[in-house]
Amino acid sequence: MFKILNTKFVRSAPVVAAIWLSLTAGIIIEFNRFFPDLLFHPMS
């Protein structure tokens, strides 16, 4: 019988990478929503 929370699958590299990239993208998107112009520094 398959356990619902299989720790070997959850701790595998693709799952950890997907969670990490989703979290990072969410942080950047929310930061850009509240502070829209801080991620792009113009040269002038």
Swiss-Prot record:
Report whether Ubl conjugation shows up as a keyword of the record: no
Give the transmembrane ranges. 9-29
GO BP terms: namely:
photosynthesis
| Stored Pfam families | PSI_PsaJ (PF01701)
Offer a single GO CC term for the protein: photosystem I
Record's subcellular location: Cellular thylakoid membrane
User: Which keywords does this Swiss-Prot/TrEMBL entry list?
Assistant: Membrane, Photosynthesis, Photosystem I, Thylakoid, Transmembrane, Transmembrane helix
What is the membrane topology here?
Single-pass membrane protein
InterPro entries listed in its UniProt record? PSI_PsaJ, PSI_PsaJ_sf
Source superkingdom = Bacteria
| Role summary | May help in the organization of the PsaE and PsaF subunits.
Q: Would you identify the family this protein belongs to, as annotated?
A: Belongs to the PsaJ family.
The name this protein carries in UniProt is Photosystem I reaction center subunit IX
Native species: Prochlorococcus marinus (strain MIT 9301)
The gene that this protein is the product of is psaJ
